[in-house]
């Protein structure tokens, strides 16, 4: 298995697909990386030379924010909103939907399992 950006990527898959296993790299960025490095799109990971793997690794390190750095930045952005006390920050703090979705019904994923209300009958 090739190790890129701290992630073991599967060797049997095509390079474009395997790169999407890295947090922060989707199909679009994976295609971009392969084109920058100059690897054919149908090439599989186990067919890559060490030099090509190194080129991919350097391209990702230089041009993209992935894995831990990306997760850290996302967490810091959410923390900043919460510290500001803005509406979006309050919604994050309360564990409710942030982007204007309805909460009277639905939103169970964000709110967690339904809580029983004492004295309420069907």
Curated annotation (Swiss-Prot):
Keywords (A to Z) from UniProt: Ribonucleoprotein, Ribosomal protein, RNA-binding, rRNA-binding, tRNA-binding
Family note: Belongs to the universal ribosomal protein uS13 family.
Native species: Rhizobium etli (strain ATCC 51251 / DSM 11541 / JCM 21823 / NBRC 15573 / CFN 42)
Keyword Transmembrane: no
Region described as Disordered: spans on this chain: 99-122
One GO MF term attached to the UniProt entry: tRNA binding
GO biological process, one term: translation
Gene name tied to this protein: rpsM
Protein name: Small ribosomal subunit protein uS13
